[in-house]
């Protein structure tokens, strides 16, 4: 079956999911063999999913340095701001997962994790839709990105140093060098990156160091071992954007002034506070909800090992191992606390690839000790135009009594509920505090069956057994700490039909069913108000039906594809519950790479609705925060906010997502040593809040760059201008819509960046 390969090819060992053929290294999607979460010997045309591979060079050419910027080169990746530092991708309107070398990372709790450094990235492959049976159950099923770590070159040493400077005192440096220890047998690669960045936004910035080291060994023919270590130390700002997102703020930059007053008369931000508007002013877009005394930092250590050996003709064994340790501490002046006092994840997956069949076993262990407190936050009552004290929420004695003191003066929620006074009602505020451990064991099988010369059926099945224990790590004095154990079995199955009418075109239809988990910070599990692990957290059903077409002519600089999909999945709410979401849509992409030019174009249409499920928001609408004393400014309802609105089950449109978006990126070499490039993203209008009282209009962002290479191509200077037309764009602060009525994020104004790169 030359037209439809089904055998794992073993002459080349690659630890990647999808490879963009290196016409210039920038990624015209081609038909190279691949290994990864969908099996060995695959090409992008062989995989029945919508996929965008992004090579390291393409990341550099499109100036992509965080997950949100992936939308410049990939359709259906529109993303909320993730409080200024998204730690998870968004695919098809839902948070996705981050995999590295085919193994799922801890990352964040609903996106509020730690920034993702691109220092270790050799390639990022963007896969839309549920994970394969090889990958197994995950919390987030809109899709995933798989990072292929950098690897040493075994033929010749090479290195690169880059220095970057931009507006607002943003500086960065990276040293990347690959040594050949034994030609064509073993090598080492080291990449060190440091960032010291100020910010356009008030009281914001980032200071990080990332060290990545990789070792590659080919001890014998048809045998390879890749191991890598990454250490990341980062301090950054939890940036909540601007509160009180009225339509006047979005359209004209006008902000309603006045500090909220609680029912007890306090002007400290709190539940059901009401603002009597005192004026409406043009607010600087840099005036965001931050505080100079906030503390926010993290350290993480990752270890990856991939061993790949050919046992016999068309029989290959692959063993992947992964370990991650995370520590994190955020203490904010608005009373928010999240401390990960140690999270450890260890996973091993063994795959046996026999002709057209893949068999495997997976074992994953996760242990998390963490403390949190988010029950007293209140964004809408705060007047950002007033003194910093407006933003501070010192806890009252009554509030402290419903929490537990972790350190002198620092209060967090206990990890369970207790009735101290015996009145039959719990006496504490619960967040995500937990001391939990979990063991996950999985078995999977995937088989490819040729039906005719041009028709192939791929079937896969998987089962995962979970055993989870959650304990209260900081129970109040005088009570026995609560704990619970839960075991469950999760199932997954998928089927893909491929039809290849000729060498250039592939048609596919995929159907998938999977059950996934719902976790708290760092992948932990919490006790509910009844001091038990909620079994519904292990019963989240996800379905995917997708049909697509891929055009990949051999020897051509062109690649194009299109996909139609219908997908159901869940949305984890702030209180730990889950809401169903149904999505359907269309996405298409086109790539071209010629001798002097490259182009990437993407488009998507998305219809996302609640799947007869409840929804939650900080307030029913922004007007709830105001009284009606100044109808000339805003017609307030006087309800007070936050009021923790709960909306009944419905099929309401999922807010915070555009119906459609378009993206384009490209570059052109117009003279010897000189090149220009740019990118553009256009999004439709969309409602910011559940009741659709505030609308983000159609927006576009245009970026441009000019580069000059000299010294026989070894030296390069590049100037980037971002937001070239200086648009005043807005983005949701967080995924899922909870903050839709209370916060919105102002995107950066026009700014420039200069980069010098020296290769040696």
What spans do the regions from the language model cover?
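Outer-membrane beta-barrel translocator/receptor signature
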Residues: 119-122, 134-211, 219-225, 301, ...
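Face-selective signature of the C-terminal outer-membrane beta-barrel domain
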Residues: 300-326, 339-473, 500
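Gram-negative outer-membrane beta-barrel transporters
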Residues: 453, 555-571, 577-691, 755-759
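Outer-membrane beta-barrel proteins
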Residues: 164-171, 194-220, 224, 236-239, ...
